[in-house]
């Protein structure tokens, strides 16, 4: 398996720290608002990475944190008239609602910053003792000059960074690039007691302290969005390696941005979309399919047209799965030619995933499987053994992509299946009673809502369009 490592700027063979285990840390959301579609990309992608490792037989220790205290949370809490701790907890609950609908599994651990203050304080103390950090008037800063490898992750030169620094001038700092490990409490803000007086952690130290606690030194994979490479992940590397004297994470993976009309998504441009707003129009599995349809390091342009294309592509798979369920196969074992074809599709799938998790190419193998499967069903030669092989192959894609195929849709969290089936039953009774106008009215109204009824030898089927 090869992974593109941001640290070395090359694809490298993945060799885990411990055979049979993968230790992963992915930066989670700052809990001051609902997640947007840009947040959803790393959440879904790294969930898929975790799923693939598990499919290959690895035990995955997966940590995704919550930053539940920072300036944005404090400001939002003031607006909402609740405490920052309450606000953080509120949006953690809302995060899980959205993540569940995107098919995201719970991490092994979801640590919160507010529950790891002692570990953070110990790490800050250690950095001061080792000469990498200094305290000024209740604030503690990391001295970037003290760490000779500063810039190695992002590829930035420290002297050039100093020359072009647009950092807010702070006379307390020795160097404008020095970053806060501990912030002195301001009036009215939450605070914790520390050796430097009341205060709270800086942003970067949180992830270092929590990843070292749960994954240990020199863990396997650290992931996040490309926007975190500098300064967040660069600062994590500096403070962690200064603290332990050992390499931090071994493989750094970063997903590309989501754009809207080729522009970066931002609130100021008004092209900012919350996941739950999108889920009002599209099922979670369609959104997940869309997010995995492009290689994770490439930019991904977002609009309704592309989501509709993802929906149509997913329906092709759904229709095949439905046809496979309904076909009455011939008795007999799987045919050799079918075994060989399906083995080839799964080989292509594995090769794509092992080449830096190329989900787009892996999906192409799924559609090859679907095309071939449809021809076999149409031929009338499908055996019971053939059918079982197709079902087993589909289970692999479901397991890794985290998408159930052939299921009836949910919109805005509501399962419409019982309502549609009730209307189908009412329509059937109306037709028996020769009330064809009313039966046609139900069919036509459902069509207006995007639901098509199809008469088949086994009864009426329905699907979305």
Curated annotation (Swiss-Prot):
Binding site for Zn(2+): 27, 207, 232, 236
Cofactor(s) the protein needs: Zn(2+)
Cofactor note: Binds 1 zinc ion per subunit.
A biological-process GO annotation: cysteinyl-tRNA aminoacylation
Sorted UniProt keywords: Aminoacyl-tRNA synthetase, ATP-binding, Cytoplasm, Ligase, Metal-binding, Nucleotide-binding, Protein biosynthesis, Zinc
Motif annotated as 'HIGH' region, chain positions: 29-39
The reaction(s) this protein catalyses: tRNA(Cys) + L-cysteine + ATP = L-cysteinyl-tRNA(Cys) + AMP + diphosphate
Pfam families hit by this protein: DALR_2, tRNA-synt_1e
E.C. number: 6.1.1.16
Gene Ontology cellular-component terms listed: cytosol
Residues engaged in binding ATP: 267
Sample GO molecular function, one term: ATP binding
Motif ('KMSKS' region): 264-268
Subcellular location: Cytoplasm
Primary site of residence: cytoplasm
Subunit structure: Monomer.
Protein family (similarity comment): Belongs to the class-I aminoacyl-tRNA synthetase family.
Protein name stated in the entry: Cysteine--tRNA ligase
Protein source organism: Carboxydothermus hydrogenoformans (strain ATCC BAA-161 / DSM 6008 / Z-2901)
This protein's encoding gene: cysS
């Amino acid at each position: 398996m090869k992974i593109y490592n941001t640290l070395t700027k090359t694809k490298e063979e993945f060799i885990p720290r411990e055979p049979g285990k993968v230790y992963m840390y992915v930066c989670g959301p700052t809990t001051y608002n609902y997640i947007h579609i840009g947040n959803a990309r790393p959440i879904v992608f790294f969930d898929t990475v975790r799923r693939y490792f598990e499919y290959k037989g690895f035990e995955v220790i997966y940590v995704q944190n919550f930053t539940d205290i920072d300036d944005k949370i404090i400001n939002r809490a003031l607006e909402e008239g609740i405490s920052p701790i309450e606000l953080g907890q509120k949006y953690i609950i809302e995060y899980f609602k959205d993540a569940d609908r995107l098919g995201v599994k719970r991490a092994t651990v979801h640590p919160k910053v507010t529950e790891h203050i002692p570990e953070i304080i110990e790490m800050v103390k250690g950095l001061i003792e080792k000469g990498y950090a200094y305290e000024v008037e209740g604030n503690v800063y990391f001295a970037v000059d003290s760490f000779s490898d500063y810039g190695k992750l992002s590829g930035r030169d420290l002297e050039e960074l100093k020359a072009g620094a647009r950092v807010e001038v702070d006379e307390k700092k020795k160097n404008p690039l020095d970053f806060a490990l501990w912030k002195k409490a301001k009036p009215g803000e939450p605070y914790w007691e520390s050796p430097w007086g009341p205060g709270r952690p800086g942003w970067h130290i949180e992830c270092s302290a929590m990843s070292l606690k749960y994954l240990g030194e020199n863990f396997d994979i650290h992931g996040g969005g490309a926007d975190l490479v500098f300064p967040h992940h660069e600062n994590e590397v500096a403070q962690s390696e200064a603290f332990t004297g050992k390499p931090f994470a071994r493989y750094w993976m970063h997903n590309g941005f989501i754009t809207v009309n080729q522009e970066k998504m931002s609130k100021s441009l008004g092209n900012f979309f919350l996941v739950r707003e999108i889920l009002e129009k599209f099922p979670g599995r369609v959104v997940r399919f869309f997010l995995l349809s492009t290689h994770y390091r490439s930019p991904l342009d977002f609009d309704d047209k592309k989501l509709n294309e993802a929906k149509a592509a997913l329906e092709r798979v759904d229709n095949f799965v439905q046809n496979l369920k309904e076909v009455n196969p011939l008795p007999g074992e799987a045919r050799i030619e079918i075994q060989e074809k399906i083995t080839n599709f799964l080989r292509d799938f594995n090769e794509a995933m092992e080449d830096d998790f190329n989900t787009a190419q892996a999906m192409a193998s799924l559609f090859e499987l679907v095309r071939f499967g449809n021809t076999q069903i149409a031929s009338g030669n499908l055996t019971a053994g053939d059918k079982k092989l197709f079902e087993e192959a589909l289970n692999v894609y479901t397991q890794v992509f985290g998408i159930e195929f052939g299921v009836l849709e949910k919109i805005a969290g509501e399962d419409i299946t019982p309502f549609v089936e009730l209307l189908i039953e009412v329509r059937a009774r109306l037709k028996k009673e020769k009330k064809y106008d009313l039966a046609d009215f139900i069919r036509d109204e459902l069509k207006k809502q995007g639901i098509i009824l199809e008469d088949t030898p086994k009864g009426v089927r329905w699907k979305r369009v």
